[in-house]
Amino acid sequence: MKKRIGSFLFFALGGAFVFAQEAPASGPTAWQFNAHANFYFIPDDFFILPVFQADKNKLHLEARYNYEDRETFSAWIGYNFQGGNKLEYTITPMLGGVVGRSDGMAPGLEVTLNFKGFELYSEGEVYLDFQTEENHYLYNWSDLTYSPKDWLWFGISAQRTRVYQTALDIQRGVLIGAGLKNWELTTYVYNLGFEDPFVLVSISKQF
């Protein structure tokens, strides 16, 4: 199973790299990449959730690991709808395949709305397990932030996931982040005042 996941990841990311080499370095048709590393510091547990995204015009490609389940890889293809004036939006419906500890498929949606320094970001999916309907699950990660400066933002966050367990079905928290050039660092603190508080540190780079 690990060999199958590794081969899938190699060809998915390798294909994106080949396309990137063929694309011009600048201009409206160039590839844009975004790599994330999400570090979960949970009581008596720790894991990393990496995400890689590639966009070219309307095309959106994405790869995730440890998202739907531990030791599980998912690959996605989607279509970007972008526009707006005062209210800017990016809406990306997607379809993904999931292999690893969990095997299935998932329709998904990513939404980003920007208005006068406020941003709502939400990513959701309905995981459909190939083995049993009892494993079907609705995932969601949503952040609402305000940026007083281009390099600084803070806000609230909510997650619904199965990769870790707490007493709450929906993890709720606060966040603060900062950026420098193409790098971003965001720290989340979830479930303050409840039984299972934990910290998430997210590092991302655009290139």
For each feature predicted by the language model, list its residue ranges.
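Cleavable N-terminal export/targeting peptides
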Residues: 1-29, 207
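N-terminal carbohydrate-binding/catalytic regions of secreted carbohydrate-active enzymes
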Residues: 62-63
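N-terminal Sec/ER secretory leader and immediately downstream segment
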Residues: 46-51
